Each structure stands twice: as structure tokens, then as C-alpha cells.
Amino acid sequence: MAVYTDIAEDDLKWFLTEYDAGTLLSYKGIAEGVENSNFLLHTSKDPLILTLYEKRVEKSDLPFFLGLMQHLSARGLSCPLPLPRRDGALLGSLSGRPAALISFLEGMWLRKPEAKHCREVGRALAEMHVAGDGFALKRPNALSIDGWRGLWEKSEARAGEVEPGLRDEIRSELDFLSAAWPSGLPAGVIHADLFPDNVFFLGDQLSGLIDFYFACNDLLAYDVSICLNAWCFEKDGAYNITKGTAMLEGYQSVRPLSDAEISALPVLSRGSALRFFLTRLYDWLTTPEGAMVTKKDPLEYLRKLRFHRQIKSPAEYGLSL
């Protein structure tokens, strides 16, 4: 979450009259994240999250995101729920941006997750994959294998500002992944961004998943690889196999991975590491000065990518083969 667009209090109060949300008591911007402008609202009824959708988010995708939250919530997954306007629509407009009010989810994200938390995340991810079955809308993953080369080309000329010699390495990686990317694996709705700051806990109990604005249709095991990258590396760059084992056991307690998915995990993990390196690189080079947004280091994911290149067997992630 982040703030790119400021809002005037009078405009916000007028916006709230279109909802059964009570009267505004206070609001503040939320700096974490990189995609949309987000605000925490306290009203005379319930706390809410106000999201203004910025230019990177296609307005045509919003029915998918908001409808998915409704679909998952109706099937028992703990996640935020869009608040409908008085006219029944889920989407309004504020400060020249499409805007929505979303229910506030109790909990906090973990700064230092442990293996027991990784197990809960794995289980919740699998529950989401199962609950997503039957969702009628479709959204291709624009940030998967077919989109990476174009994304790299946007940053390639300046990549040397981050680390010298990146051009040859990333070009070679793109060539490898284009040839090795698996097909025919189980697919469905994936979260595609289930980082620690998108999972809330109350104590050690997972209380819900948030931020579905990268959700799309893709390989389910690719979503697993994103979580391994996001949750199972330590700050020094080392892969924590205890966390990896816990996450994979948690996932498979709900939805066992097929042999083909397990075999593909090293390639998928290289791909998901490259995906986040590329988007972080682009944001690092292009985020405007003064934006209330937390930029994230692209080199963290370059190091993870290099780790995955050395993997000889999926067992090295913590799988029992």
C-alpha cells in the first residue's frame, strides 16, 4: 500500500455519503507498498480502507479484483470485503481516480515470521487456491513469462546503475526461462503477491489475506514459488529450509502438489524471483521523488534468483520426495 494521490477532507466526506459507512472521524495515508493510494478511515461505524487505484492498475481489471474478494469471502476465506455503494456498485470515484471502500481486517503483518507462521501461510494459500475454483471472471497474468522481456526492456538501459554487468545475466536468464517454462500444470486463481505484509496475524493465528490487486489466472505452483521467495529467505540471503518445509507441508495438507509441479518448482522459483527483481528494478529507477511510498531493493531478488540457479533437486526447498 502507498499514497500517490492526496485527498481533500471535504471531498472524502462527500464521497462517503454515497455509502452506508457512517460519518468521517479521521483518516491517514498508509505508506507501505507500491501500487495504489491507500488510507485508513475511522468512521462513526467501522474502520475502513479507502483505495484509490493509480495508473498502473487497469480500471477494466477492478471487477475481477473486487469480485474475487467477494467470491473468496463467500467460500470461507478470511479476506477484506468491498463495501457496496448505496446504488449497489462497488466502485466510485475520488480525486480523479477510481476508488473503493474495503472492510478493515484485524491483525498485523509479521516482521520476523517463524516456521510455524510459514506453515499457516502455506495452508492459507492452498485454501485460497481451492476456494478460487469456480470464480467466473478471468484475468491473464501480465507479469508472468510472456511479460518479463518487455518489462526488462524498460529498465535495461539503466540497469547498470543498480549493478554493473546485469545486461548479459538477465538476457541469459530470460532465454533460459523462455525455453524451460512448464506447461500443463494445474492452474487457477493465484494471489501472485502473498508477501508478509499481505498476510495478517493475531498472535500466532493467521487472521486473513489482503491486497489482491495482482491476483490473476496462472499456475498454482507458481504462486507457491512466490511464497517460498517471499517468506523463506533470511535477511542475510540464506534460504531457511525449516521455513520452506513448514510452508510446503502446510500447503500440501490442503492441496497436495503433483509430481510435475514438484519437478517444476526450481524453474518456477527462478521465474518468480526474476519477476520481482524486474518490477522492483523498474520502480527503483522510476518512482518519483517525494512520493509517499517505500521503494524495495531489487538486488534482494537478484540474489534469490542466483540461489535458485544452483538448485539440483526440489528436495532442497524442503520437500520430502
Curated annotation (Swiss-Prot):
GO molecular function term, any single one: ATP binding
GO annotation, biological process: threonine biosynthetic process
Enzyme class: transferase
Gene3D superfamilies hit by this protein: 3.90.1200.10, Phosphorylase Kinase, domain 1
Keyword tags: Amino-acid biosynthesis, ATP-binding, Kinase, Nucleotide-binding, Threonine biosynthesis, Transferase
Domain of life: Bacteria
Pathway stated in the Swiss-Prot or TrEMBL entry: Amino-acid biosynthesis; L-threonine biosynthesis; L-threonine from L-aspartate: step 4/5
Pfam families according to UniProt: APH (PF01636)
Catalytic activity: L-homoserine + ATP = O-phospho-L-homoserine + ADP + H(+)
EC number, as in UniProt: 2.7.1.39
NCBIfam families on file: PRK05231.1 (NF003558), thrB_alt (TIGR00938)
Protein known as: Homoserine kinase
Organism (species): Rhizobium johnstonii (strain DSM 114642 / LMG 32736 / 3841)
